[in-house]
UniProtKB/Swiss-Prot annotation:
Bias kind Basic and acidic residues: ranges: 1-10
A Gene Ontology biological process term: translation
UniProt similarity note: Belongs to the universal ribosomal protein uS14 family.
Disulfide bonds: none
InterPro entries linked to this entry: Ribosomal_uS14 (IPR001209), Ribosomal_uS14_bac/plastid (IPR023036)
Gene3D superfamilies referenced in this protein's UniProt entry, alphabetically: 1.10.287.1480
Bias-annotated ranges (Basic residues): 11-23
Gene: rpsN
Pfam families: Ribosomal_S14
Protein name: Small ribosomal subunit protein uS14
Length: 101
């Protein structure tokens, strides 16, 4: 089980990213638009740099919904390999059977 503080920190980052996404997209569009004057694009770059780092989507870590484990998390169901194995061995994942040959 991951530390509760790490899980909460990641949840705060998710919330902050969601709130700041429109503003970030607007600023990035201004920066990428070559028809705008250089001063305006530079000002947009400075505004983007002033935004909190945690509002960037790259700071979000994929974590297991059950355990909070940060590594080996499948995006499809947001569970770690260990959680999938545990649920599968208890028969809680439909269609998942233990392999034998």
């Amino acid at each position: 089980m991951a530390k509760k503080s790490a899980i909460e920190k990641n949840n705060r980052r998710k919330k902050m990213t969601k709130n700041a996404a429109p503003k970030r997209a607007r600023l990035k569009a201004i920066i990428a638009d070559k028809s705008k004057p250089m001063e305006e694009r530079f000002a947009a770059t400075l505004k983007l740099a002033e935004m909190p780092r945690n509002s960037s989507a790259t700071r979000i870590r994929n974590r297991c919904d059950l355990t909070g484990r940060p590594r080996s998390v499948y995006r499809l169901n947001k569970l770690s390999r260990i959680a999938i194995r545990d649920l599968g061995s208890r028969g809680l994942v439909p269609g998942l059977v233990k392999s034998s040959w």
